[in-house]
Amino acid sequence: MEGFSLRINQFLAHYTKHSRREAEKLVLEGRVKINHEHAKLASVVKENDRVFLDKRLIKPLKNKKFSVLVYHKPKGELVSKADPLKRRVIYESLEKKYAHFAPVGRLDFASEGVLLLSDSKAVVSALMHADLEKEYLIKIQGFVTREMENAMQEGLKLENATKGAHQKTPIKSMEFAPFIGYEIIKNHAKYSKLRVIINEGKNRELRRFFAFFNAGVLDLRRVRYGFVNLNALPVGKMRFLNRQEYNELHAFMANAANVKGD
């Protein structure tokens, strides 16, 4: 990351297992130094600075030529650069210095949760086209029926999958693969809650799936994308991948390159 500068809490969250809040606590406890001087909460780490945690040098990941952001997209934001209908887009919430970051897939306007963005086209493409698991918390109208469960277990093919889709969608039919997993958290006549895991990301796939059973989706939140969890990231906030997530991403990219080369 040539010419980079990061607040000390961002740097620690970026290159260690600690969250920003944990990083701030480490700074306040006097356990962090920049170039052998105690860091302050307002300290900024610049290129070639040496950062120490408990007297151990933090080594930025080798050959990391890209960055990945985790954004907790709120409802009412479009994953787009601009919108002709003047709806709010995600880039109005992100800092301007991230305007060149591209999103990994989409989350529709009415949905919230994990959205990954990167300054590397290769990373975006690899993550988008991989069959990584996506985990969602969903609230639907009415009961979870036996028919729904059968379809989640066995898959579903619809010639007319327009219910739950946008009115002007060009995608009319859709085939739904069996879900990787699901858990019924609450099953009630008024509304039900589920946790579902899929490894596809088709246009409004889950909304179309449940709409077929006349169960409108009331809430949809993506809580995990592959090896990246939403955890306690507040709505409308962003963070960098932490060290463990970057390690997993590097391993994923190396494997993707090997598969491509076969």
Swiss-Prot record:
One of its GO terms (molecular function) is rRNA pseudouridine synthase activity. GO terms for biological process: enzyme-directed rRNA pseudouridine synthesis. InterPro entries: PsdUridine_s_RsuA/RluB/E/F_cat, PsdUridine_synth_cat_dom_sf, PsdUridine_synth_RsuA/RluA, PsdUridine_synth_RsuA/RluB/E/F, PsdUridine_synth_RsuA/RluB_CS, RsuA_PseudoU_synthase, S4_RNA-bd, S4_RNA-bd_sf. SMART domains: S4. Coiled coil: none annotated. Residues 6-70 form the S4 RNA-binding domain. This is Uncharacterized RNA pseudouridine synthase HP_1459. It comes from Helicobacter pylori (strain ATCC 700392 / 26695).
